[in-house]
């Protein structure tokens, strides 16, 4: 790996270092991470899974993602909001997910809060994309040093505070920034990564919600 954080894959392509040449992580890096998302279900899924990741690695969550989807009705927040204590018990007994009561209860709570956000803003996408940082808030160069030095940003702090004020849980500034990176509100593919210009083109073409 170079000092910039770029590694060359077996296919000769330059990529961000963090995929570590693990096949499932590499697919996630190449096909999902950073590509702009405006679908409410995917946005809700991601912010919930980032909450489950707290204290763990994203790879652990990624490898259990289909199990999470099965346990939480595909992260349809209208359905998850109706979960009761029986559903909590079912999830706690599900070895395919992270069996953390606080995070399970948080997901149900956040589903109810997501409905409130949708009622107020028309969609989760409209709420979150309002916070897309302007060019003047972004670094001139996105390299490994920048990523390490900025696990959270002023924008993610603002979003975190607003969500918490609205009753959301497990949405700290670092969790929120990881969500922003993954959902394409920022392009944090490193300079030199083959995905960076692809993501930038998608962001340019995107019709903001």
How does the language model describe each region?
Residues 1-209:
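HhH-family (HhH-GPD) DNA N-glycosylase catalytic core used in base-excision repair
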């Amino acid at each position: 790996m170079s000092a910039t954080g770029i590694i060359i894959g077996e296919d000769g392509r330059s990529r961000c270092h963090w995929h570590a040449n693990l096949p499932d992580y590499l697919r996630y890096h190449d096909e999902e991470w950073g590509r702009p998302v405006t679908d409410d279900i995917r946005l809700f899924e991601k912010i919930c899974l980032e909450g489950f990741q707290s204290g763990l690695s994203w790879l652990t969550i990624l490898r259990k993602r289909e199990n999470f989807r099965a346990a939480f009705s595909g992260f349809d927040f209208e359905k998850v909001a109706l979960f009761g204590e029986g559903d909590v018990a079912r999830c706690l007994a599900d070895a395919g997910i992270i069996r953390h009561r606080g995070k399970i209860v948080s997901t149900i709570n956040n589903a109810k809060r997501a409905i409130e956000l949708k009622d107020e803003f028309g969609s989760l996408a409209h709420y979150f994309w309002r916070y897309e940082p302007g060019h003047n808030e972004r670094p001139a160069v996105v390299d490994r040093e920048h990523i390490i030095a900025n696990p959270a940003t002023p924008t993610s702090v603002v979003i975190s505070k607003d969500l918490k004020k609205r009753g959301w849980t497990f949405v700290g500034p670092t969790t929120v920034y990881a969500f922003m990176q993954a959902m394409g509100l920022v392009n944090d593919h490193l300079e030199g990564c083959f995905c960076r210009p692809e993501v930038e083109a998608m962001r340019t073409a995107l019709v903001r919600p």
